[in-house]
Every structure is written in structure tokens, then in C-alpha cells.
Amino acid sequence: MPRSASQPPDDALQGNLFGAPEPAAPSATATASEPETASHDLSDDELGADAAARPRTRQATASEGSSEAPAANDSEPSRDEPAWGHHSQLDPLQLTPMLRHYVELKAAHPERVLLYRLGDFFECFFEDAIELSRVLELTLTGKEGGKAIGRVPMAGIPHHAAERYCAELIKQGYSVALCDQLETTPTKGALLKRDITRVLTPGTVLEEGMLSARRNNWLAAVVVEPAQGKQPLRWGLASADVSTGEVQVMQREDSSALHQQLAQQEASELLWAAALDTERPAWCPERLRLTPMASTPFSPVEAERTLQQHYGLSSLDGLGLPEHPLALQALGGLLGYLQDTQPLEEDSRIPLEVPAIVHRGDALVLDAQTRRNLELTATQRDNQLQGSLLWAIDRTLTAMGGRCLRRWLEAPLMDRQAIQQRQDLVSSLVGERSLRLAIRQLLRPMGDLERLAGRAGAGHAGARDLVAIADGLERLPQLTARLKSAISTGPEWLQQLLSPDPALAELARTIRHKLVEAPPLSLSEGDLIHDGVDPLLDGLRNQLDDQDAWLSHQEQQERQRCGISTLKLQHHRTFGYFLAVSKAKATAVPEHWIRRQTLANEERFITPDLKEREGRIFQLRARACQREYELFCQLREQVGAMAAPIRQAARAVAALDALTGLGDVAASGGYCAPTITDGRGLQLEDSRHPVVEQRLVETAFTPNDVQLGEGTDLVVLTGPNASGKSCYLRQIGLIQLMAQIGSWVPARSATVGIADRIFTRVGAVDDLAAGQSTFMVEMAETANILHHASDRSLVLLDEIGRGTATFDGLSIAWAVSEHLAGDLGSRTVFATHYHELNNLAAERDNVANFQVLVEETGEDLVFLHQVQAGGASRSYGIEAARLAGVPKPVVQRARQVLDQLTA
């Protein structure tokens, strides 16, 4: 929410989002006599009688060994049970001043969990407290709400652990509004000034602990234009990763295309103009988090105004957005949402890039089914990274490189020149092992410059973040020197590394000059800025050195006065400065000393002179810390202003990291550089599955050839169960995809024609929630393929029609095969147990039969996993059943029945 210019920035009281407070302004009354954790800034009315030392651990249940017996009557509330469960049930005028303020803020954020800073805790009340205690397993306690109200529900989290707890809330889909203290000392008789400083939602977080390092965190917004009659649905989609600054927009037709795009992107949060109680539309994937918004930010006029204000433009014509009005409206709604959830000051606005317009045909299309079947980024069985294609080929060393490779896999290229540029760089890196190793050595310790720059631009970066930025920028000239020795030209992004921006090197020098090498996590306790940077800070430090000298002299002087050689002048964070002597010497101290504390073996004293000097030291230290904080904020603002060029360099580093990793995989895996063509041919010699071959330990992978698209559009693949047909299908799809991201591929040689889409139908299960049987799921997937495949598509089918009667299934499989080979002309591999489909090859010249070989030795069956021309005549299903452990009598009876049926 907006704040006046006089209010401090979000972290004026915090080193980072949840860090230590800003140095307090020096005060003549400041002393160290108050405990560090005391809530001395809170009035009794604010704290209530129950605030002191309440428990923070989860209450034990009977199964956890609780020694307390359960209540005799569960319906009878205990004395401490809150009387009110929702703030709307109360008259605000009857609440205490603090709770009245809480309710006012909650009314502005009814859909979010409100965390309200009270001393060392963030507290929740009413319904939020009940929900927080349930979700985070915290103790639900109560607080006096007013004389006429009694106790209200309360739960809280320590402020130093707030990031961890908020991360868990965000992970579970909640949004959080943070109300922080905006001053350290209240006006007499008034509450501390507090206000909402941040709103955390799944799509807007910037904190490292709330983000997945190796995947983008997309915030998306959609505008849908209702279909008129039989006209297709028109929609515009805007997506932004606020942590990296990337912005994309697109405008399309057809609700299935919208569903496919949303499923592929997997945004953390989707915004749309709708009422809170609106049902989830059919085009929205079930697992996607929907955030309804008012329609105003999405209106054409308001959206255009928001974009002009954000990008500082008088016209949007230069962005190309007027030609995509629905996408423009979606982006306007997205930026409006960010304005409501992020700081609005010019020096702390999240730096977002100019939107990139994604056109139809820019990338190979992968629907959710294909992504799942090919196991691109997660396994089909348990949704884990290990065992996926990304796991097999990701050898990136930086988080931004990992995100880059993932984006490439999710949107393979269709432009042959762009593919060839990537592949040429991979080839250079494969051939130059020393270059590859040198680059990887430079990349290994590099921080996430993309997100670090974003945090700096938003005003949330800490001192260690800036040091990490400097370290990364200092490595750019070293990368340049290495690259120029082997690579002289390349794509536009590579020029960022071959000719780095000199302003970035200057920025790195500035950071190194001003910040110490290993700054503390807190921004409030000093030790951030080098000596010699600021005359005022140097003067304050010199005065503090003088005070240290006085303390040392005072210690020696008091020893001589008392004759106690073991006397020590020490400091404690809670009690301040004191003179410590042993118990035995306590009677020898002067009478003007004042006893401060008694310990088992030691007595501690203060003197008027020491106390007066302590106040002076604390004032100097507070002024020095305040000055360091001001200097740091100036430096952070300077770094944030350079967020755009830092991110440009970071993207170049990320691409280099991804390509170097692909080069490493290619060199160690015996891959080849595929020949990329504009034709339809797919010729692979001795191709292998990139994941399966890495997981084989005791046996070698059996390579196979592929011939598609040049005379043969449809391959009918037959063979026994468990012989490797599905693996062969997936292998073809993965190699097609790898070639189109610019990678080398696992084969002896490869010629790959660019595909516009990859379709897979491999296995099916019941969708009980949607009321669909296995057969209906299979037919729906098949229908999708037949409606959208073209002659440039690659179609991989593993069985069609097996969920119904034999002749029905065969008829469907035959008709589908004819349509794919004839009307559509798609490059297709169809694995089937319907051996009758082998007859298609005699009817159509563009159909070929292949089989997976098997060898019989007596009753044993040996799978050779080798694909060879010709059709199989048997499926060996009974033999496969025997190998799977089906009881022998059942196997014998199955053979008898088979003999009878085939007689």
C-alpha cells in the first residue's frame, strides 16, 4: 500500500524483510539497562496481561505423551478458550486500541493472513490466529480484547523466524500481509506507528528462502473475451517473474490452447477479473492457484494508464501491445496487482523488463500429456526430478543457468538458425575441453545475479547480496578472456560476454570500495562500510576509538585505586558497562560504586562516571550505525539502478552455463551433433534413450535406428510385452526435443527435421474425479491429437483401442492410423499388439512395419530390445505373464485356452 514520503522504507526497521531493526535515532536517555528482548516500547493496554512469557511450542497431544488428562466435557470451553472466532462479530469501539487498529488493517486485507508486529513477535488474532495455529501447528492462546469482550484468539511467530514460517504459508497457497513497526519509540500515550509494509503472495515473493532456485516463479494474469456463438474463445495472457524481471505476453484463441499454456507454464498464481465466489472455469488447470480481482485494473483505459506509468511512456505503440489488446489488459491487471502488494516508492519498485511478445510458432508446442509422458522435468510415477530428462542433462552450476535450461526444455525452438547457433556453441565447447573446464570453474561459485539484482532494485537486498553481485560481476572479464580465446562470434546474447559493459566492472569496484568483504547479516549493527569511505562515519569511529581508550584507561585507574589487580571493565548487551570483581574482593571497592548484579563468584558494579560515559558511547554508536545504514541504502539504490544491465549479463551467463553443461553431457555421453533441416525427415542411427542409458549399471543400452518422414510417415511397431516399445517411443520424442533446444543427441548420427508439436499417448489411467474410464481418457487424448496434429508434428502412440471389445478397438486403431498416415501426414510411430495393422503397409506406401526382436530358448524368453524391419506375429503375452510370476497352473491353463481360440 502507498506510504508518505516521510515514512521509512520497508527495511528501515529491518536488515532484510525479517531482519534486525534500523539503528534507532540517538537519544539522551538511551542506555543499555533495558533487556534486549523486553517490550518496553509497548504500553500495558497494548500488551495485555497475558503477553509475558507465554509458551511457543505446539501443545502435546495424548499420543505425544501429554501428562494432562482430557477435559471431562469437550463441549465445555476452558477458561482460556477464546470467546470470539472472527473479527466481524465484534464492535470495533469495544476493542483495545491495538486490536482496533488490527481490525482496520484486516478489513483492507480480508483474504490474507495478517501478521502484526508486537515487540519480538508477529501476532495474529481472531480467525487468522485459529488458521495459523492449525496450519503451522502453533499454540493457540488468547489476549484480552477489551472489558466488554474478554479474550480473543491469538497465535504468533518470533520475528527472527518469520521468513521460515511465511515460506510455509506461501507454500500452502496462503497470502500474507505484514504489518511492521515504523518507529522504535512511541509518542507518549500513543501506540507505536505500524502499517502494512509487504504483502507476500505465491507469485510476488522475492526472498530466496521462498523461491525454488532452479525454476521461474511466474505470476500470470489472464483476460478472457466471452465467445460469441460458435466463435472460439479469445484470450490474452501476461506473465512476470518478479524475482528475475522477465515479462511475457501473448494473445490467442481457443480455450484448449489457454488450458495447455497454463498447464505448461505452471504459474504460482493466476490473476483474473472475477468475484470471489466464481467457480473455476474449465480452461483453468485444477492445481493452479486462482486469485480473483476486481475488473477495474483489467479495463483497457486503466491498463494502458498503468503500463504508461510503470514504463514511463506516453505511448505504448513502441511496445507493440496495441495490436494485442487482451494481452495489454492482462498485463495492466498484473501490474496493478503488484502495485497493491509491493512498495511504490521510485527507489524500491520491482524492476520489470519491457514485455516480450510470444508469437505463435516461436516454440515447439508440448501439451501437458506430452510433458508428463516424456518425463521432461519430473518422473511420471512419483513426480521427482531424478529420472527425468532435466535430471539427465542438467549439469549447470548456477541457479540462473538451471532456470535457463528448464525454460529451453519447456519451449524448444522452431527457428533453424537459432537452433544452429546454440548447437555451434555446444560443438565448440565439446571440442575445447580446457575451455569447458575453465568456464565451469568460473561459474561454480557465482551467485544468482538475476534475482540478486531484482532484490536490490526492489530495496530488499542485504549487504551480503551486494557482495555476491560484486563477486559475480568481477568474473565477467575473466569469462570474456576465456571465451575470446576460442569463440569470436555468436548470437546477440553472447556479445554481452565478449564485450561486457564497462559500467558493470565500475559498479563492482564501487561495491568493493564501500562494503567490507564479509559483512554481517544485520544492517542495523554496523561493521558494513570500510574506513575512508565517508568523513562523517570516520569521525564517529574516531570518537568511538577515543571512548575505547578512555575505558581502557579507566580500567587501569580503578585497579590502582582499589588495589585489585583482577578487576575488569566489561560490557554486557543487557546491562551495559560494569566493573567486575571477585566475591572475595567485593568488600574492597569504593563506597561510591553502585552494585549492579551479583553472580555466584562475581560482583558487578557501576559508577556515575561510567554510566555517563556509557550514554555517550551509545549515542555515538547509534549515530555511527545510522550513518552506515544510510550509506548502505545509497549504495543499494545505486546497484538497483543498474538492475537491467546486470540482468542482461546474468542471462548471458545463464545461457553459457546451460550450453557448457550440454557440452559436458555430450562429451561424456558419446553424443553427436544432429543435422537440423527444414524438411520432415527424422533419421537416427544407433539412437539411445538419454535417461535410461544413464540409469543402467550392469548392462549396456541397446541402440536402435529410426527412419521417419522421408517416404515413411507411419511406423507400425509390434513386439512382445515388456520388450521396450514404450522406451523406443519416448527415446524418439526426447531426441527430437533435445535437437530443437540446440543440444547434441545420444546417437551415432542424426538428421532431424523441425517439428511444430510432439504428441504422445503412452498409457492411460482412470480419471475418476472427472467420471472418465481408462478407455474414455484414451479416446479424449486421441481426439486431441487428431484435431491438432499437422504434417510437421511428431506423433507417438502406444496402444489405442485396447480398453474396449477386440474388434471395436482394432477398428478404431485402424481408422486412426489411416487418418494419421493419409489426411494428416504426421510423422507417427504406433506401438500396438493388433498385428492386423501390419496389413496397412501393403495398402499404403508411406507405412512401414517394424518389430522389437525376442529370442526363444525352450520355455525361456530373452528380450533383445532391438528394433528391426518387419512385423511381429506374436505378442508372447503368456510368456510375459509367466516371467512376471503368475502361478504355473494359471499359465498352463492360459496356453490351453489360447490353443482352443486359435485352432
Curated annotation (Swiss-Prot):
Q: Which GO terms describe its biological process?
A: mismatch repair
Supply the PROSITE patterns for this chain. Answer: DNA_MISMATCH_REPAIR_2
Task: Name the Gene Ontology molecular function terms of this record.
Answer: ATP binding; ATP-dependent DNA damage sensor activity; damaged DNA binding; mismatched DNA binding
UniProt keywords (A-Z) are:
ATP-binding, DNA damage, DNA repair, DNA-binding, Nucleotide-binding
Region: Disordered, residue numbers: 1-89
Q: Which SUPFAM superfamilies match?
A: DNA repair protein MutS, domain I, DNA repair protein MutS, domain II, DNA repair protein MutS, domain III, P-loop containing nucleoside triphosphate hydrolases
Keyword DNA damage annotated: yes
Q: Which GO terms describe its cellular component?
A: cytosol
Q: Compositional bias of type Low complexity: which residue ranges?
A: 20-36, 49-62
User: Where does the chain bind ATP?
Assistant: 719-726
Function of this protein? This protein is involved in the repair of mismatches in DNA. It is possible that it carries out the mismatch recognition step. This protein has a weak ATPase activity.
UniProt xrefs under HAMAP family: MutS
Which NCBIfam families does the protein's record reference?
Answer: mutS1, PRK05399.1
The record's family statement is:
Belongs to the DNA mismatch repair MutS family.
Protein's name in the database: DNA mismatch repair protein MutS
What species does this protein belong to?
Synechococcus sp. (strain CC9605)
